[in-house]
Design a protein with these regions (language model features):
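Active-site rim/loop-helix segments in enzyme catalytic domains that contact anionic ligands
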Residues: 1-53
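Metal-dependent de-N-acetylase/amidase catalytic core
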Residues: 36-169
Length: 169
């Protein structure tokens, strides 16, 4: 419980750095997330509630990122549930009819961006926002060494930066 409270505080601090004004915590246990029907339903409800044009999530199939690191099982589970919430769940009246009865009308997401895939077809130049990304990640001190974040983010981003269709700054 203490770790969960700490992680929420860290996330709120990171979101403040990024200018994110509202955060919704679903409060599933850390380290135990599964791509369950309950999680998919929660995400479907949020999609129907907020009606986003775009959803961005991780790669549900991404176990390894090159030789860099092993992807956390919670991240894979969240990504799978997010993809399944986008399609087919959020856009149809046939799934989660109780959400429909509660006033959550189906909503079709127009774009789904999946990051962390070896088959990427979109690259975005993050040069202009790298410092703020690093500062936001530094807020997660229980998960990463704040003094090392800048180094490993730069090492991670630099080889990918040439793939961006934008000019580098």
């Amino acid at each position: 419980k203490e770790l969960a409270e700490l992680r929420e505080k860290e996330q709120l601090a990171a979101n403040a750095v990024l200018g994110i004004k509202e955060t919704i915590f679903l409060r599933y246990p850390d380290g135990e997330l599964a791509p369950s029907i309950a999680l998919r339903k929660d995400l479907t409800r949020l999609i129907r509630q907020f009606k986003p044009d775009t959803v961005s999530t991780g790669n549900p199939e991404g176990w390894f990122y090159g030789d860099e690191y092993l992807n956390h099982p919670d991240h894979r589970a969240a990504a799978q549930a997010a993809c399944e919430a986008v399609f087919p769940s959020a856009g149809t009246r046939l799934i989660f009819t109780d959400l429909l009865a509660a006033g959550y009308e189906p909503h079709e997401v127009r774009r789904l961006y999946i990051h962390g895939t070896e088959k990427s077809n979109t690259w975005v130049d993050i040069t202009a926002t790298m410092d703020i990304k690093i500062k936001a990640l530094q807020q997660h001190a229980s998960q990463v060494d704040p003094n090392e974040v800048g180094k490993w983010m730069t090492e991670w981003a630099e080889p990918r930066s040439g793939r961006s269709r934008s000019k580098r700054g």
